[in-house]
């Protein structure tokens, strides 16, 4: 925390964001959501897309600020357009669930694809859901299995659960209850 503070005092945006994460989550210091938001805001204003995404999440869930889902989407979009994979995934999820915007599965799948192209695990998994159920693109269960497998191999637990279900009921693969149980345990 001390070194992040020293670097943040020198206006280093990444350090401001990391110090904000320390305050938000109580890493090495007492939690202080207001300080976290102030640091994210300062780093965002300095043009640091990951901080812009973190600030968006604060607005989405009300960490240190009033919930403002529309503002969250605006911040996610700004960071997503700067190629921030986490923001692309979060923006896709907003479209997927209609959070701060009208639900739009096609937009969701497009943003998930952009983040998945950067190997962002959650986006790979969510893109798999889009393919499995035909949300926003043509249904392709084989592609869904490939994406779930990739996300699982990258260490994303929900992908193991979805893959386990595919093996349990035979969605896109032969039924294999032993493999299903193994995947559920890994999840």
Segments from the language model and where they lie:
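Low-complexity/repetitive intrinsically disordered segments
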Residues: 1-10, 15, 38, 42-45, ...
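Short helix-capping/linker turns of helical repeat alpha-solenoids
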Residues: 10-13, 25-27, 32, 45-49, ...
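Hydrophobic face of amphipathic alpha-helices that form TPR/SEL1-like repeat modules
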Residues: 18-25, 54-61, 75, 90-97, ...
């Amino acid at each position: 925390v001390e070194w992040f503070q020293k670097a943040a005092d020198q206006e280093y945006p990444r350090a401001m964001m990391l110090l904000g994460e320390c305050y938000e989550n109580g890493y090495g210091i007492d939690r202080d959501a207001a300080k976290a938001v102030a640091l994210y805001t300062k780093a965002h204003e300095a043009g640091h897309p990951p901080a812009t995404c973190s600030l968006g999440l604060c607005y989405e869930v009300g960490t240190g600020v009033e919930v403002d889902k529309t503002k969250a989407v605006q911040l996610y979009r700004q960071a997503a357009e700067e190629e921030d994979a986490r923001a692309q995934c979060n923006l896709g999820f907003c479209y997927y669930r209609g959070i701060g915007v009208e639900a739009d599965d096609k937009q969701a799948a497009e943003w998930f694809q952009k983040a998945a192209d950067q190997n962002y695990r959650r986006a790979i998994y969510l893109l798999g859901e889009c393919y499995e159920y035909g949300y926003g693109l043509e249904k392709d269960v084989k592609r869904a299995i490939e994406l779930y497998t990739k996300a699982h191999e990258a260490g994303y637990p929900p992908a193991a659960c979805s893959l386990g279900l595919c093996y349990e009921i035979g969605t896109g693969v032969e039924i294999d209850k032993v493999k299903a149980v193994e995947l559920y345990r890994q999840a």
